[in-house]
C-alpha cells in the first residue's frame, strides 16, 4: 500500500525537478550575487547576535541555573555521604 502511494509522489517530484526553475526563479548574475554577500553576512550576524542575546537573557531570568546547581550539590553530597558510610 505504501509503495502505491509513494510512486505517484515520486513521479510528481521528478517532474517538478526536471521542469526547471520558473522564469521568476532564474538565477541572477554572479556579480550581483557576490556584491550582496557582505550584506547577507552582516544581516546573518546581526540576527544570530540578537537570538543569542535573547537566549542568554532568557536563561539568566529563569530558575534553571539555580535549580541545576542545587540539584548537583544535593546529589554530590548524597553520593559523598554514601561513599563515606560504605568505606568507613
UniProtKB/Swiss-Prot annotation:
* Pfam families according to UniProt: ApoC-I
Q: Which family does it belong to?
A: Belongs to the apolipoprotein C1 family.
Q: Which function does this protein serve?
A: Inhibitor of lipoprotein binding to the low density lipoprotein (LDL) receptor, LDL receptor-related protein, and very low density lipoprotein (VLDL) receptor. Associates with high density lipoproteins (HDL) and the triacylglycerol-rich lipoproteins in the plasma and makes up about 10% of the protein of the VLDL and 2% of that of HDL. Appears to interfere directly with fatty acid uptake and is also the major plasma inhibitor of cholesteryl ester transfer protein (CETP). Binds free fatty acids and reduces their intracellular esterification.
Cellular compartments annotated = Secreted
Q: What name appears for this protein in its UniProt entry?
A: Apolipoprotein C-I
Annotated Gene Ontology MF terms? fatty acid binding; phospholipase inhibitor activity
Query: Which InterPro entries does the UniProt entry name for this protein?
Result: ApoC-1_sf (IPR043081), ApoC-I (IPR006781)
Q: Which UniProt keywords are present, listed alphabetically?
A: Lipid transport, Secreted, Signal, Transport, VLDL
Q: Source taxonomy lineage?
A: Eukaryota, Metazoa, Chordata, Craniata, Vertebrata
Amino acid at each position: 500500500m505504501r509503495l502505491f502511494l509513494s510512486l505517484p509522489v515520486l513521479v510528481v517530484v521528478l517532474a517538478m525537478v526536471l521542469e526547471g526553475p520558473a522564469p521568476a526563479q532564474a538565477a541572477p548574475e554572479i556579480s550581483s550575487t557576490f556584491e550582496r554577500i557582505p550584506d547577507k553576512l552582516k544581516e546573518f550576524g546581526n540576527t544570530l547576535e540578537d537570538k543569542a542575546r535573547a537566549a542568554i537573557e532568557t536563561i539568566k531570568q529563569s530558575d534553571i541555573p539555580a535549580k541545576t546547581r542545587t540539584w548537583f550539590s544535593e546529589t554530590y553530597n548524597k553520593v559523598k555521604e554514601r561513599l563515606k558510610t560504605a568505606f568507613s
